[in-house]
């Protein structure tokens, strides 16, 4: 490619590109905010292997929140802190919050998933005599509501038992294309929609013997392996109501943010659900979500705006996992230094500007300070110690 472009240089090696990206990432960490700006922080943990987690804090200026109808722009966000560790108690998170606040000033808002260790330390974040306003991610709250309303019922537990048995019964058979999707135990109710969608799909084919997807599958076989779903038809109708309400609400919040008129707007959006008979699951879920948004809205000063979704933070984690690929199997690595670059469009001018202030030695120092005792570092030390004596 270089020859085709007429560039008289060797193609950079994989290691060289990694070093440059880490250097740019460390430089981006130094270019964030100052104490005069009103900033919203988002904080979350990402698990890797064993007990290892990284505390990631990203932020944006409140003035950069998008207008209603638009989603957050990753370019407006900045990575503020990347802190790996094994123990994340409230005092550990508080230490990192204070360290960041001393550097760039405390936030006006802190948005997190509601975990106590992320939420409670925010009481010590004081800006202009006011405590930071703590907001909970709507998606996590909706998942908690779904677990309480649906997941704890005996019918749902029986349904999940059948789903597990069905996976084993249909894989590697002519019914393999009807196999249920896998669900992570930890985030089951944040991703239940895929399982409910699967149920709807299978019910369709159970009721339509002429469907192309049933070609080569006998009536007896499909009923034997998947006919149990018919017994849950009424339950699935109620569960799907809950999921549809959640989907509508999340789509709305990701384009509206939190404002002083959000409750009224959400109530209008969910009007058809709120008018259902009182025993319907869809109405119950809609009422609870409206109550949650109302409680969040009441925390805002008059005329203010904030955000109630960490979906963009989860997207950033997803990008990083793609960057890591097989490296993630060995715990967190020096590639964490690249994470801030995933929020930025990399241009030649940006690289020149950032590289003026950060050298290769600064990257190595950041790695020593940030990743002193990771799983990978301990594993490498174990090998060095063993083979040094041979």
Predicted segments, located by residue:
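Short, solvent-exposed secondary-structure capping/transition elements
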Residues: 30, 67-69, 151-158, 328-332, ...
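Acidic/histidine-rich catalytic cores and adjacent linkers
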Residues: 112-125, 143, 165-390
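Inter-helix linker motif
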Residues: 126-158
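RNase H-like nuclease fold core
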Residues: 3-110, 116-132, 151-152, 166-169, ...
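Helix N-cap / beta->alpha transition motif
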Residues: 13, 136-138, 191
